[in-house]
Amino acid sequence: MSKQPVISRFFKPIARKEVTSEKGVEKEKPVDLDEEKHNEPATTSRLMPKGFDAAAETVTDEVIEIEVEIEHESEPKIEIKNGTVTAENKSMDFAEKLNRIWNDKKRVISNNDNDDSDGENDTIVKKSKNNSNKLTPLDQQVKDLKLLHMDKILVIRVGYKYKCFAQDAEIVSKILHIMLIPGKLTIDESNPQDSNYRQFAYCSFPDIRLKVHLETLVHNNLKVAVVEQSETSAIKKNSNASSKNSVFERKISGVYTKATFGINSAFSSNRKNVLGQYNSIWIINFSEIDKINSSFFMISVNLNSGEIIYDTFECSTTSIENLETRIKYLNPIEVLTVSALPEKVKLRLHGSNSTILLKEKEDIDKEIMEEINKSTKGLNLSAELFELVPVLYKYLTEYNNEELLLISENYKPFASKKHMVLNAAAIESLGIFGEEGGKGSLFWLLDHTRTSFGSRKLREWILHPLLDKKEIEDRLDAVDCIIHEVSNIFFESLNKMLTNVPDLLRTINRIAYGTTSRKEIYYFLKQMKSFSDHFQLHSNYLNSQVVSNDGRIHKSSALLTNLLTEITSGLKEINIENILSMINVSSVMEKDTYKQVSEFFNLNYYDHAEEIIKIQGNINEVKNELAEELSSIRKILKRPHLNYKDEMDYLIEVRNTQTKGLPSDWIVVNRTKMISRYHTPTSRKLIEKLQYQKDILYQETQKEYFQFVKRIKNDYFALNKIINHIATYDCILALASTSQNMNYVRPVLTDESQFIDAKNARNPIIESLDINYVPNDVNLSHSAGKFLIITGPNMGGKSSYIRQVALLVILAQVGSYVPADFMKTSIFDKILTRIGAYDNLLKGQSTFKVELLEIQNIIKNKTENSLLLLDEVGRGTSTEDGKAISYSIVDYFINLPVCPLVLFTTHYPFLGSINSKILKSYYMDFVEQKKEGEDWPSIVFLYKLRSGITDSSFGLNVARLAQIDKDIINHAFSISEKIRQETETANTMNLPILLKHILSSNDLKPQQKIIEILNLQNDSQEL
């Protein structure tokens, strides 16, 4: 059998426009291939003809050489020049056939859409003398769009691909590592090289990769707009004549940034962490109080949680600690401002990867302004804060998220009398979150939540420890109740159910914004229905144990009783089953977008189905006409059992050996070696009519879907309340899981102020890392001492101990059990820390300046009910200056009318000798050892807190642990001993002079002279 030419890649569907054929020879003039740039195929989801492969329409040069195998002795070389196929030998029949195929191919492009610039051709079109300066229709459309949106990267659908053009393409190609097709690099053609090209440079990627690439682009802090076709080819053909020859209309379908990507994009239901879930959008303004201080007015929006935080705070030219704290809490990614911010504030915001956008105050629609007034009524917003709301509303309209600002229940103040605010220094130094909540943080220790929205609420709880004793007790009661009831089938089933719950809070907010997908809304309703079924199934248990006054849960936990009661009543109020029945489940699972949209509703239950049913009737009529046409075709071909090849393209297949007697007006769609496929003129018109009706159905079901979403949105408040109650339950469950750890105990809260008493307490974070942690007691009170001086060797556990105390207090006030045998504590309104040594090059601050600024902030913000942690203050400067500053700070606090509780670690032992009733001295215990070959004493850390003072930091022991050479350490020890002896000698010589000065002083009373002499004696003994 002879070989046939291998040219199957040319067999693609021919144009939908009528093309007649006589005896296999096309009556069509040659088409100039140079004009076939960017020809636009229709898109998927009824926007692209079925079977059309735009990617295959690439023309790579003016001359294309195709090597083929045929049965002749010499293999011919076939060339395609300017759209005409020629051959070098006798195989002219084959060349003629190939020429016909090539012309068919060109008609696919030209007839699909008369736009000569929307195709998938990756041809580099260089400008020639004959070429016009005029842009192609697609490029002109791109230019018009881009000039209106210069602040965005435009990702534009063209057929089965998304493309970026000009300067956008240059940026995107570098980030995504995809090919850049040369062309004009600037949209305004300002680049001198642009004159060499006829079209814009571009890069492209398949439409199925949109979400992946979109996430990458916004992760690089780009603002990206996705542009989609807003009309179909069928509707275009049936529209007015003036638009038929133009490009497809395109509109921006969505705008995305890092802050908006998570809420405006659909993800799989089991995805817990979403890009931007903790990020927020700020709008901020300020006014100067004086030359040093300024008031800042801020509104923060988290689109995922729906929270709107408003706040007024002060910053100075020397300290922006309040701004630091709010950045830690709210993670701004976009910051709007109506006036230029101070340079220090801008620098800090840029340091947190925030994009700062200057916005003008604009007048907005009167009706919207009334809605804003209504939603903010009762919040007592200052005039400075209120004027920011319309600016933020205007900005959010670009992302279709502006509706959030009209929900009054979402507004919350940053600070409240109900909870503590941990400042930025405390969050950092106590390891509250670590690296994004990673291993070794308090959040990691407590986060046993099963849902993503529960995890976010737990994060809020940790950042906002409670200040109200009753609320703390309510949480602890709920934790107790869960621990005892967890094995009950109601809780066991509910807890298991939570492990597979999607992010319901994110979904309900997406419903409010109108951006949710069909699949997502189905799973949302299905999940809410599951909760409803579960509570209904266990209604007897809930009535007897929760609702009844004699029930175990009712008696043991008011918080849990309230949660379960309100969830039950809320689920009954919303007829979720009725709403869910309106959805055709099979369509949700469809991969075909058209079917997913057009068949979404169960028309037996959907109560606005009249128009949809009418259009479906029109579609069925056309299908009946196609069936009648098939009967006529059967008679012509004398094949009574003939059927269309499929019910998509409605093709008639005829063997090539039987094509001679076919009607001349039948349209060849494509051919293979064995068969040819045809449309009749009637079937072609009916197919176009059918496609038009299908597109109308698509649009109608889209419209009805948005109305369906609005119906669910009407129950936003009730659904949001239920979801927040479920999140609270999830947090209680997480605290119960933590509290069941070995040797955790429920803390006892006392009304007595300034009191902590803990037995065998441990650092919860260090212990959770499977480290054998040595427990220590904590005793702070009026009688036991309110100011603890803690000395001891380097790495002896001083810093871990003071962190442990703060973490115990946070756990207790969050509502968790604590790692101790016993703990009794008062409630603290603030935890202020100065821990660690580091500089801040970004702010131009040295280690010592950072220290002093933090001390200044502590002194400014402390109250008598605060807990202060001061770790080795004065280490950032010389020894003498460090001693002086440390002494002054200790002296300041112990002489306050009411000194707060202070834990002060130091390497200056003399501070422990300060005479004060509230000051107590402790050290971290150790054992000295002498090893062979070492001149200095080695130590073994015992990590046990002892009463008293140690006179050495044993820094050389740390050098040994760091594996410094022994000779170097021995030499360092000899120098250290020499300096110590010289210092002792100098002080001994000065002792008589100091004694004489005290005794001869007329300013001191006899009792004061005795105290000074005793202090002098203590100092000399220490030295």
Swiss-Prot record:
Compartmental location: Nucleus
Primary residence: nucleus
Sequence segments annotated as region (Disordered): 19-46, 108-135
UniProt binding sites for ATP: G792, P793, N794, M795, G796, G797, K798, S799
The organism's place on the tree of life at top rank: Eukaryota
Biased composition annotated in UniProt, kind: Basic and acidic residues: 19-40
Entry GO CC: MutSbeta complex
Region (Mispair-binding domain): 129-259
Example GO molecular function: heteroduplex DNA loop binding
Record InterPro entries: DNA_mismatch_repair_MutS-lik_N (IPR007695), DNA_mismatch_repair_MutS/MSH (IPR017261), DNA_mismatch_repair_MutS_C (IPR000432), DNA_mismatch_repair_MutS_clamp (IPR007861), DNA_mismatch_repair_MutS_core (IPR007696), DNA_mismatch_repair_MutS_N (IPR016151), DNA_mismatch_repair_MutS_sf (IPR036187), MutS (IPR045076)
Record's keyword terms, sorted: ATP-binding, DNA damage, DNA repair, DNA-binding, Nucleotide-binding, Nucleus
Keyword Nucleus annotated: yes
A Gene Ontology BP annotation from the UniProt entry: removal of nonhomologous ends
UniProt record similarity statement: Belongs to the DNA mismatch repair MutS family. MSH3 subfamily.
Function in brief: Component of the post-replicative DNA mismatch repair system (MMR). Heterodimerizes with MSH2 to form MutS beta, which binds to DNA mismatches thereby initiating DNA repair. MSH3 provides substrate-binding and substrate specificity to the complex. When bound, the MutS beta heterodimer bends the DNA helix and shields approximately 20 base pairs. Acts mainly to repair insertion-deletion loops (IDLs) from 2 to 13 nucleotides in size, but can also repair base-base and single insertion-deletion mismatches that occur during replication.
Assembly and oligomerization: Heterodimer consisting of MSH2-MSH3 (MutS beta). Forms a ternary complex with MutL alpha (MLH1-PMS1).
Protein name: DNA mismatch repair protein MSH3
